[in-house]
Amino acid sequence: MAFTVSQLSEERFEKIAYKHDRAVNAWEPINVTGLGPLIPVANAEANQLCVYYRFGIFKFTVAKNNTIAAGEAVYYDSVNKVVQDTPPAPGTGFYLGKALSGGTGNPTGTVSVEVSLND
């Protein structure tokens, strides 16, 4: 899987139960109007109740050749399943949060940054 995210800290995590109108994959962020970015903790079919993280600190893979500095705004590219420091094209991603660490993406997708969700 090209996308990696893991819970890094026990600081201020908020979980909510929510039914999304489309199927979701565990740990792949979605953006919900009125709620912002949510991270599902399990795979779920459309309109199935699932638990999501609404706030917290998570680790994401950085887009190839993209540099993210600590403190920068971070955007999720839902097509390539990576994060970057510039907004993706309309309909292909969304604002995720602020970077707590920095890094530059490489061809193997092994560089990651910590992101404070909804920050």
Regions flagged by a language model, labelled:
Residues 1-119:
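Surface-exposed, low-hydrophobicity beta-strand/loop segments enriched in small/polar/acidic residues
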